[in-house]
């Protein structure tokens, strides 16, 4: 599972790109779990987006800090399902 911190307002063309960089270097990409929806985010491009989803949890404490607790809770629920 991968998570990343970014600022979609200041860096909409590279939002949470670090997640994508890590993902690309993994030898077993098919083992990555915890993909999340891109819904509710406003960005132009992200290396962390694959097939319309983020490859993990994208957190934006600069522009949407109020949404972080709910996003974390949803992500943990996804992870629990994928590991059980």
Language model features with spans:
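FMN-binding flavodoxin-like domain, especially the glycine-rich phosphate-binding loop
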Residues: 1-84
């Amino acid at each position: 599972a991968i998570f990343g911190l970014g600022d979609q307002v200041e860096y909409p063309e590279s939002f949470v790109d670090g997640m994508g960089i890590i993902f690309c270097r993994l030898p077993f990409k098919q083992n990555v779990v915890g993909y999340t929806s891109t819904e509710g985010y406003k960005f132009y491009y992200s290396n962390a987006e694959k097939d319309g989803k983020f490859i993990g949890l994208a957190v934006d404490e600069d522009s949407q800090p109020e949404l972080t607790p709910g996003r974390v809770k949803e992500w943990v629920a996804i992870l629990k399902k994928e590991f059980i």
